[in-house]
């Protein structure tokens, strides 16, 4: 595999262009640098930037079908071997405060033993962990180690978000035990986030498993074992997602039952009130017809006695309902 000149991959508006020093650190790429397997280059681009897009479209270092993939529309996670290189599409939790975490960020990577080209539009928060390690001199030393560390960071962020969703479900279940119904749309959003995570993390787990099983020349056996561990860890997260989705279904039924019971209780209360006041309403309506004059209208105690009779009647009906165990 021939060496690459630094000037061939030094894109002016790149997010960064670094050379791995082989000892866990990096240094900025210069035009005079020689890129080889001992000192691979990591070129990170925002594909909507003009010069980055132009470099992706014209560089001879990338196969033709890779150019479109690195700057194309977002797809589900996948991995494809293209000659000596490998094209990988991954998804990351969205760390932007203006958007929901489940609006996942796509990152595309083309790499071989010498060159790592990664592209994105929105910031990939998980890469900050890898960048910090490289700046401190404790990062990966080669392309295989870089890929394992990136996948590990992506899985860490996904696991943290899955754990947050799990905690929300536990709180929601505790509130339901106290007959506290969540705000409208809360459970639907929670379920949607779980489904979105399930949709993208399942193929991402398959990507990790395939990378662990492929005999890529720039990955060692130890790195393949680490990649398999990452795939297994994400698989456990998927099992947690499946359990959470099932629990949200149970909670939806429980919420519907609680709301139905509340409605039935209110309807029952209104029916009892109607039964209590129905006799008094009948009498007041009957007396209020006034076709032949109001009975007792000329007697000074007529209205008082009528009110007392109504109170006694209402009390009698209430007592009968109580003894009948309707109240």
Swiss-Prot record:
Give one Pfam family: CorA
Using the UniProt record, give the first listed, main subcellular location: membrane
* GO MF entries: cobalt ion binding; cobalt ion transmembrane transporter activity; magnesium ion binding; magnesium ion transmembrane transporter activity; zinc ion transmembrane transporter activity
HAMAP family, sorted: ZntB
Gene encoding this polypeptide? zntB
| Membrane-related topology note | Multi-pass membrane protein
Instruction: Output this protein's name.
Output: Zinc transport protein ZntB
Domain of life per record: Bacteria
Taxon lineage: Bacteria, Pseudomonadati, Pseudomonadota, Gammaproteobacteria, Enterobacterales
> Where does the record place it?
Cell inner membrane
- Topological domains, Periplasmic: 295-300
